Amino acid sequence: MSWLQVKVLTDEAGAAALEQIFEGLGALSVTMLDAADDPVLEPDLGTTPLWRNTQVVALFSADTSAEMVREQLERNQIAAADIECEVIEDRDWEREWMTHFHPMRFGSRLWICPSWGEPEDPNGVNLLLDPGLAFGTGTHPTTALCLTWLDSQQLQGKQVIDFGCGSGVLAIAALLLGADHATGTDIDPQALEASRDNAERNSVSEGLTLHFPEQMPEMQAEVVIANILANPLISLAPKLATLTLPGGSIALSGILKDQEEAVAEAYRNYFELDPTEYKEDWVLISGRRLPY
């Protein structure tokens, strides 16, 4: 079976209008992607994350006329150069994903590896993932920054909190790197289920506890990590500081370069901050909890 796929490059202001146009033309699905094909981070409640350069992708049945779709888009002031139409064949998408997911190294020890292949470094710390359980695999710069930071820490025997855990990759990496216990929290039940499945695949289920934020017990940990977004991080500064033991370490990401100072300012009263780490347009802010 084949499909007509139509892609349009736009900005965040035009994405919602395009979605309505595509739905009016009978699209079977409409997806919004970062033009760089980066995955979605955890958004603020009730919001849809859009990027400065957004690609809107619509899927139609094969008998849909590409010329008709083009004509309607151009009537709505969409430049012809921004429209891409392609007939795609139905595929085994799981196998397609498998061909593109290769081992990735973070720091000196840590690897993210597909579970069906041989580890690149049998003596390394290998975190195994499968299709369907792998959102937050390390391909996004913020995840990569967090994984590299974890690899640089001395985690043996420590408690770790992964606040906004998503697929649990950061908590699981901490356990594989020697942490005694990790606590993950997320507002999304699917994220908690993915974390549970990924922990089981990596044989660290006994060391991982998962909670919705409102059900999280009063606790403190030597290491706290939060890869969410800048605005939630700013509002959560008192909470995350309370979760971090005096002298403990924190790492924060999901922060764009132009948001760095606002996030850092929210945490300076609680932490002695390290030099910021950068990857592409994203940053990681880390530090140690002050004793007061």
Swiss-Prot record:
The gene is prmA. It holds the Pfam family PrmA. One of its GO terms (cellular component) is cytosol. This is Ribosomal protein L11 methyltransferase. Keywords: Cytoplasm, Methyltransferase, S-adenosyl-L-methionine, Transferase. Belongs to the methyltransferase superfamily. PrmA family. S-adenosyl-L-methionine binds at residues 143, 164, 186, 227. SUPFAM superfamilies: S-adenosyl-L-methionine-dependent methyltransferases.
